[in-house]
Design a protein with these regions (language model features):
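Alpha-helical, largely C-terminal catalytic domains
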Residues: 1-206
């Protein structure tokens, strides 16, 4: 018997942004899905527009496990995680131990297939690059949505994360920020009003 997927299913109980007042709570499972979608998109954008060779499906798969250790450790808020180099190193060590524990839960017959999903390997470096960018992007987009809802508690985090995202030297990230990010600051009515209307098909005269 393996507890691996039973633990992963508990992502939905891991609350993010624990020290912040949220207009809506975001759990780890929701965040993970969004990161997977954005990582896939970044890979596609790089390939189609910037002559990249990233595997979009691989990036999405890696993203599904990018915070897997938090089902054991919980979400450690950024101010604590980055308080000092010593604490940052300790956090990385704890995360590594948690990932090893999850990995050990897998049946031996399939364990090697999951290892690259739980531990970064050089062969997947291009895919992990877009996953990490997507992770940062999604944190910024959460802040944008909170500010749109009138929650100024996220204003400072939004400013810091925007600066961090803009400093990522990946053209696909800049494209995503310009093309997709502005819509996250809009209400549903605004999205509906600005949505391009489908063109009516031209009927041929008999």
């Amino acid at each position: 018997m393996s507890h691996f997927f039973a633990y992963l299913s508990r992502m939905r109980f891991v609350r993010r942004w624990g020290l912040m007042r949220n207009t809506y709570d975001e759990n780890l499972q929701e965040h993970t899905l969004q990161v997977a979608m954005v990582a896939h998109a970044l890979a596609v954008i790089r390939n189609r527009m910037f002559e990249g060779t990233v595997n979009p499906e691989r990036a999405a798969a890696l993203a599904l496990f990018h915070d897997a250790e938090e089902v054991l450790t919980g979400d450690v808020v950024a101010p604590i995680k980055h308080f000092s180099h010593k604490i940052r190193r300790a956090h990385l060590e704890v995360a590594g131990v948690a990932r090893q524990k999850l990995y050990a839960m897998l049946p031996a017959a399939i364990r090697k297939d999951f290892r690259p999903l739980l531990f970064e390997e050089k062969a997947d470096q291009p895919e992990w690059q877009v996953v990490h960018a997507a992770d940062k992007l999604c944190a910024y987009l959460k802040c944008v949505e909170e500010i749109r809802a009138g929650n100024e508690d996220f204003a400072k985090a939004a400013a810091v994360l925007k600066q961090q995202v803009e400093s990522i030297r990946l053209p696909e990230v800049a494209y995503f920020l310009e093309t997709f990010a502005p819509s996250f600051a809009m209400t549903l009515d605004e999205l509906n009003q600005s949505e391009p209307r489908p063109r009516r098909p031209q009927l041929r005269s008999q």
